[in-house]
Amino acid sequence: MPLAFCGTENHSAAYRVDQGVLNNGCFVDALNVVPHVFLLFITFPILFIGWGSQSSKVHIHHSTWLHFPGHNLRWILTFILLFVLVCEIAEGILSDGVTESRHLHLYMPAGMAFMAAITSVVYYHNIETSNFPKLLIALLIYWTLAFITKTIKFVKFYDHAIGFSQLRFCLTGLLVILYGMLLLVEVNVIRVRRYVFFKTPREVKPPEDLQDLGVRFLQPFVNLLSKGTYWWMNAFIKTAHKKPIDLRAIGKLPIAMRALTNYQRLCLAFDAQARKDTQSQQGARAIWRALCHAFGRRLVLSSTFRILADLLGFAGPLCIFGIVDHLGKENHVFQPKTQFLGVYFVSSQEFLGNAYVLAVLLFLALLLQRTFLQASYYVAIETGINLRGAIQTKIYNKIMHLSTSNLSMGEMTAGQICNLVAIDTNQLMWFFFLCPNLWAMPVQIIVGVILLYYILGVSALIGAAVIILLAPVQYFVATKLSQAQRSTLEYSNERLKQTNEMLRGIKLLKLYAWENIFCSRVEKTRRKEMTSLRAFAVYTSISIFMNTAIPIAAVLITFVGHVSFFKESDFSPSVAFASLSLFHILVTPLFLLSSVVRSTVKALVSVQKLSEFLSSAEIREEQCAPREPAPQGQAGKYQAVPLKVVNRKRPAREEVRDLLGPLQRLTPSTDGDADNFCVQIIGGFFTWTPDGIPTLSNITIRIPRGQLTMIVGQVGCGKSSLLLATLGEMQKVSGAVFWNSSLPDSEGEDPSNPERETAADSDARSRGPVAYASQKPWLLNATVEENITFESPFNKQRYKMVIEACSLQPDIDILPHGDQTQIGERGINLSGGQRQRISVARALYQHTNVVFLDDPFSALDVHLSDHLMQAGILELLRDDKRTVVLVTHKLQYLPHADWIIAMKDGTIQREGTLKDFQRSECQLFEHWKTLMNRQDQELEKETVMERKAPEPSQGLPRAMSSRDGLLLDEDEEEEEAAESEEDDNLSSVLHQRAKIPWRACTKYLSSAGILLLSLLVFSQLLKHMVLVAIDYWLAKWTDSALVLSPAARNCSLSQECALDQSVYAMVFTVLCSLGIALCLVTSVTVEWTGLKVAKRLHRSLLNRIILAPMRFFETTPLGSILNRFSSDCNTIDQHIPSTLECLSRSTLLCVSALAVISYVTPVFLVALLPLAVVCYFIQKYFRVASRDLQQLDDTTQLPLLSHFAETVEGLTTIRAFRYEARFQQKLLEYTDSNNIASLFLTAANRWLEVRMEYIGACVVLIAAATSISNSLHRELSAGLVGLGLTYALMVSNYLNWMVRNLADMEIQLGAVKRIHTLLKTEAESYEGLLAPSLIPKNWPDQGKIQIQNLSVRYDSSLKPVLKHVNALISPGQKIGICGRTGSGKSSFSLAFFRMVDMFEGRIIIDGIDIAKLPLHTLRSRLSIILQDPVLFSGTIRFNLDPEKKCSDSTLWEALEIAQLKLVVKALPGGLDAIITEGGENFSQGQRQLFCLARAFVRKTSIFIMDEATASIDMATENILQKVVMTAFADRTVVTIAHRVHTILSADLVMVLKRGAILEFDKPEKLLSQKDSVFASFVRADK
């Protein structure tokens, strides 16, 4: 057929110009083409020449991006313009098809306008990103011309009586409005930027973030199209496929998204609430108001997007209704009644009655709906992430001010705080993500019910009633599910606590043969957890079942009721399949209801917990002595605003205040020079708990400035508490603590600024920083150097001096990377002595004028202690006139003290110089004298020089390298370093980018067993086959309903027609019932499979780990093992089953849908191939990026949580150093790193979902177009068309879920892979060569030990730590073993228990070679006390006798021997008194005494003490030594000496050096030899 612009009819009115050219419709249309052609000719050269060249691309970088005024409005108007132009094109084609003649002018101008609109926005984008607004003048001209020409057309339409009944008139009016608005936007740009018509144009710089090329998260800065489609992520996803993603690849957060910005916003909201409500500033209601005030605006935006998306979602059912209804009726040819300007214009009704138009509108509605939905998700998640970062920062700042009593003995534990950070902040984040559903769900339900009623009539209310009535059941199931999850979490936490204790004390458990006891303890808790998990699985399966069964049941009841009770009503395919789609939409919000309710409840609980935490007590700042105000410019760097304690009711403390009222207003003593003291306490009463009895009573001390002060006393007398009270960490009941404010804070630090004072605290200025080394060393998860310098500038000379003073150089030399080696997990890669020395080195390195050292010698031998005292404390500190306060048990150092404070039972016994004690406390002084009895200075210097002689250090524990004798040969250093690097998993994090093998999936499924796996696969396939059969039968049924309608059925008997309907209804009922039953079977099978696998894997893992050799625990970080039991087991328990169910369901649904569409229209397969290729590459690129981003999200969260845990653990140290601001800055960096990873992961998920849903929309369009074509040619029934379209919509819904679940499953299977890796760990050989019947029951009854040519190593790849050792120990002998650090003392003791590889020689005990004994028998018949005390949470009785073999009298006897009987009797419950985790409610010395008592309980004939008295004062140690010698007179005792004087009374003394026996004789004989090494040790220890 010939084509012509104005039509092929010569007599057409389109050619007439007798009434003027503007009255000619074709001319007006041609006139409308002119502006578009103008724009194309002007802009194309600029785009292709200016921005198309490679040189120009170099200059267009995101650093020049900015948004012109009206940016978003322009893009929105352009999108609307494009939509209206598409409608105009379609309207023109339809209008042109009515007549025989073809009129190109009906749609060609609209096509040109469409191209021009796209060109205009591309042109605008390039100009905007290059910040060159003068070229916008072309757009100004274009919008002006387009507005004028379109207005002329609109006026001419009006003149020719073309009105609202014609769609062309409405579209033209809309175009006039749109062009006018775009013209106004362009004029506004001129007004604001003044780039033309003004003399002084305004220069606008791009955002500050874009000037920083490190900012790579560009979502806030890109144009609206890129925001909606995440187009800017394309380059990132492509790069991620080529190389791994790391923190450098994702860059930094924009300023507006950083934790500090959001924290400040939250603080402003809190301040605003505080001004409104002064009563409950931190209450839960105030927190909710503050959160809404700070982040509510973005939440409203997300909710708006969500409501728009939900409303657009109803376009699918309506378009299906229209298309199928159109195809189900006879084709009607519209006879033109009236022609205007020579052509016929279709009406709106005719336009929407066209099936192809509806298909295109459905496609566009799906695109827009998916875009709005993903925008809602993104905005909500971004808001939640920002909120999480703000709350985490607020929690951290609160921690910095938290009262120590809340952490040590109060209501707040470190675990609770970490849960608050890790769990509760995430609960709030996810609540904000689900929050838009709260008001979107009612809208969706109401609209859905109205549309169902419109389509089905009254019968629709039946199905809606079924869904709504079942909503309470869903809520009940969700509530039970939440309860089961909470119960599971409680048992899981208890199991992890027990597992953590078991792993931390694994050495003790193996030495005592208690593995099975603690393993059974964990398994008992696991059984309780599995019971709760079964309930969780049951309710999960019910929830899954209801999600899939409710739509089937609602459709069944509705359709059967519809044809049964309303026989004359319409049951055509259009009604049935539109209703089916509406039911699926209606069910969705009811499914979400349970999740939203659970999330809301969890958020309410989390906010309540947050409120309680923020309201907890804070520390006080101590007073400073009055001084002259400092100059204004000399404010101290660490000066902090004084803090106020939250008032509480403390009856016990108030009573003390009443008694000590006169002490409330005190000033420092003015005896002598006012500046001769550093700290002064007057009448101080201090307590840990708010309502407790004071731990320290009537404390009045004066610590001199620039001198060495020592605090001494017995175990538990309050020495460490006195230091903490001085630092302001204890609750002060009464009295006063004064810091000399004339002391400069540190080198380069000025005194505090008095202008920071408040009226309420005029005398409570802050003290300066104090270098503090706690008794329990606190190390950062950082390098050795970073732990020592501790954020201070690196000074090489000072650093070397500190390293030498702490004798750390030999230990550093043996580390894999020297002082750049990562140490973490509380320093578990290092020995106790090394941790202690690094902690002390930190205090020595700092430039503070005040240094507090809390028992720094407890874990050091005599040589290291003497060297640290001489080179560190005396030379580096005291000689530098720094104030040093030293808590110690080593009384031999008292002569060095300038001032001594003696404590007893929480009070000051006396303070003064050593001479003062000699004069006034003669008895105490004589007691000290007998303990210290030092030699002259010449001998001391000789000993120090001897200690400086070079020897290979063996200080590094077995976890790092060869340990003993490792560096004897220099040529093996490289081999050793390589091995250490391989063993040390903390030295470097290797990014595992390799794809997780699907063998892990096979291992997971095979763990379920072949029967359960077969049932799982068969039930899933059968269920989806039945679901397809249900919908196919519905199509057949509705097609028959068309034939059997009253107008067309032509039945002779109405009973025959009713019979046909009943047969269809009956078969439909059977299929639906079968489908519901299969839904139940599949949901139960999936959860049962998950339970069985979880139970089997955990049991295998626990049994394998508990039997692993000690070498495994020394070379594998504890956190890595614990993560297998925590996060990986949790993934297998709760996440993999649900992911597996979702993956199988979404995959089978997509396959079913594509199969049905291909069956309905086979030509669809042609279009399916390219779509499948695109889909494959999208998912391939996404899975790589998603896996990397997910791992990055997890790995960046670990340092954040670790930083919180480190801060809580080292809070006293941080506050003592005044490093709060530095640690807060690190927190912000960690939070931003985690948030940027989370945001990129969110953007990547949205990138995938937008593309997958766009592909789904394409599937719908192609399926609709092909179905319509086949139906119009009478090759396809309307029912099958409805079936195909319904399944096409299903593809668009489930395609992205399939890829997302595939990526999630790939990540989650990593947990299975990691656990199976641990299952390959080789176990210890517990079996013995001797049968149990051949071992005497009372073996060993004598205690005779023969050591024959014994050589020991820790691993077959390592060097020996003991070489050719021979010794004979007679029954009942007391053997003392000494030697320098690394000489092999501990290895010697471990050899008795076969904890090391005895590759040569043997040990014979009472005639039996221990290598032939079963390990459990051997270890249960010996006793050992380790250097590091290990206590478990539980009762004292459990800690002493977990096997429950001993009577109470035996336990009390052991406590009496250990000097603990009085302490335990004073506790509530006595033997049943509770010991907290790690024994934190007892001092370090008391914990060691409990370990001694535990060993005494066993009453074995061989007793080994491995530096067991390191944390005990000398007086108590001497008592214990006497008791041991008396109580164990008939037993063989092997003592590894911490203080050499403790083995002077031994029968024999063994001196080890480099793994060999250097000396082995009676102590008297060795002391008589002048050149004896043992004699030199004794002289050094005096």
Swiss-Prot record:
SMART domains: AAA. ATP binds at W688, G716, S720, S721, S1483. Pfam families: ABC_membrane, ABC_tran. Residues 679-930, 1345-1579 form the ABC transporter domain. Residues 741-768, 939-962 are annotated as: Disordered. Disulfide bonds join C6-C26. Mg(2+) binds at S720, Q775. Residues 753-766, 939-950 have a biased composition (Basic and acidic residues). Residues 299-602, 1013-1307 form the ABC transmembrane type-1 domain. The keyword Transmembrane helix applies. Glycans are attached at N10, N1050. Keywords: ATP-binding, Cell membrane, Disulfide bond, Glycoprotein, Magnesium, Membrane, Metal-binding, Nucleotide-binding, Receptor, Repeat, Transmembrane, Transmembrane helix, Transport. Gene3D superfamilies: ABC transporter type 1, transmembrane domain, P-loop containing nucleotide triphosphate hydrolases. One of its GO terms (molecular function) is metal ion binding. PROSITE patterns: ABC_TM1F, ABC_TRANSPORTER_1, ABC_TRANSPORTER_2. It is a multi-pass membrane protein. The keyword Magnesium applies. KATP channels are regulated by cytoplasmic ATP/ADP ratios; ATP inhibits the channel by closing the pore, while ADP activates the channel. Activated by phosphatidylinositol 4,5-biphosphate (PtdIns(4,5)P2). Residues 48-72, 124-136, 187-303, 373-438, 474-541, 593-1013, 1085-1143, 1176-1249, 1298-1582 are cytoplasmic. ADP binds at T1381, G1382, G1384, K1385, S1386, S1387. One of its GO terms (biological process) is positive regulation of uterine smooth muscle relaxation. Regulator subunit of pancreatic ATP-sensitive potassium channel (KATP), playing a major role in the regulation of insulin release. In pancreatic cells, it forms KATP channels with KCNJ11; KCNJ11 forms the channel pore while ABCC8 is required for activation and regulation. This is ATP-binding cassette sub-family C member 8. It comes from Rattus norvegicus. The lineage of its organism: Eukaryota, Metazoa, Chordata, Craniata, Vertebrata.
